[in-house]
């Protein structure tokens, strides 16, 4: 699998893949990375890529010409690129999207800055437009990294144990069940906090049943919207 990032600040992104799980996956050649800076495709002597909006309005906009050129150059490599634009007006990214997109050959994340990208570029290239929530960031780089991380977790071999995906939050519209580590009894300020006793008995069927019950309770409390969806699909 291949990921390309189109960004005015590629150095902000490269470091993310230098440690931990994703670094090991990259070393095993489970995915490849490319970074493209639109400034390298600007035709003016200052490598300028932004200008004022036609019709007025606050802020600057990333111009169509350099954005078109960089994306067209990616297209011409014929690596089956799938263009994803990061924009607050896009649909909210979720776990189902992460699973679906993990089957793509080559995802290109197009990261806007300033007040966004000339709309005509989206009309020409966008396969999908995503947001990660109803809030505004200074650029699309962080959402792109969030999405890339979530997608890669679903690529075979990236996680040490792919079975862990089955127990993670949002599977079957449930949050992941509460998890506990040693010690079995955690004591602070004369208070004792216990691990559920069923977890200590070694009966895997009963533990699995308890985890399902706890996941359901947790979802109902923290995410009633997900819980209703889970109940509807039973």
UniProtKB/Swiss-Prot annotation:
GO terms for biological process, alphabetical: tRNA N1-guanine methylation
Residues annotated to bind S-adenosyl-L-methionine: 112, 132-137
Predominant location: cytoplasm
Top-level EC class: transferase
Keyword line: Cytoplasm, Methyltransferase, S-adenosyl-L-methionine, Transferase, tRNA processing
Subunit details: Homodimer.
HAMAP family cross-referenced by the UniProt entry: TrmD
Family: Belongs to the RNA methyltransferase TrmD family.
Official protein name in the record: tRNA (guanine-N(1)-)-methyltransferase
Annotated organism of origin: Campylobacter jejuni (strain RM1221)
């Amino acid at each position: 699998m291949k990921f390309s990032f189109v960004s005015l600040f590629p150095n902000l992104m490269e470091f993310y893949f230098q440690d931990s799980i994703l670094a090991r996956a990259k070393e095993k050649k489970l995915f490849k990375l490319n970074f493209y800076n639109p400034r390298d495709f600007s035709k003016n002597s200052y490598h300028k890529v932004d200008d004022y909006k036609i019709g007025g309005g606050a802020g600057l906009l990333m111009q169509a010409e350099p954005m078109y050129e960089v994306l067209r150059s990616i297209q011409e490599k014929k690596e089956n690129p799938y263009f994803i634009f990061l924009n607050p007006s896009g649909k909210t990214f979720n776990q189902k999207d992460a699973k679906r997109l993990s089957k793509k050959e080559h995802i290109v994340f197009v990261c806007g800055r300033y007040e966004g990208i000339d709309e005509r570029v989206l009309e020409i290239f966008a396969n999908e437009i995503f947001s990660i929530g109803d809030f505004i960031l200074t650029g699309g780089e962080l959402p792109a990294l969030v999405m890339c991380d979530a997608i890669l977790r679903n690529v075979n071999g990236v996680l040490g144990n792919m079975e862990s995906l089955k127990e993670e939050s949002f599977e079957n519209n449930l949050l992941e069940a509460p998890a506990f580590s040693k010690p079995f009894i955690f004591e602070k300020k004369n208070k004792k906090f216990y691990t559920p006793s069923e977890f200590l008995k070694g009966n895997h069927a009963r533990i699995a049943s308890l985890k399902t019950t706890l996941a359901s309770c947790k979802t109902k409390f923290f995410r009633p919207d997900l819980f209703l969806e889970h109940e509807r699909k039973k």
